[in-house]
Amino acid sequence: MDQVVIFKQIFDKVRNDLNYQWFYSELKRHNVSHYIYYLATENVHIVLKNDNTVLLKGLKNIVSVKFSKDRHLIETTSNKLKSREITFQEYRRNLAKAGVFRWVTNIHEQKRYYYTFDNSLLFTESIQKTTQILPR
């Protein structure tokens, strides 16, 4: 099966069922080093351990990302996603309101980094022992 199809299935599944332990174990199994998730377009740039890349194109469900920065909203939204109080799409919209343009999830470091349009780091969190979705 084509890598794009495999990764699309993995990302679609975690967006729906929010099973993060399964999600991260699948990414490790497929030798993912890290991935970059672009909030506005839902494009995902996956980097494998051998430095090959895979691009997953979003579904054209565009959201506007604010220029204002709100670290508290990021943390609150992330916690709500982990506790399944909100859906992944609500998570995505709230992060866009908080000024998140993209996030980078490093599988080896078990960290997620949230960045703004100007590439400044807004927030960092651990992805260990979480039950969160597409990158917390």
UniProtKB/Swiss-Prot annotation:
Q: Which domain of life is it from?
A: Bacteria
UniProt family annotation = To E.coli YbcV and YcgX.
Record-given protein name = Uncharacterized protein YdfO
Q: Which organism is it from?
A: Escherichia coli (strain K12)
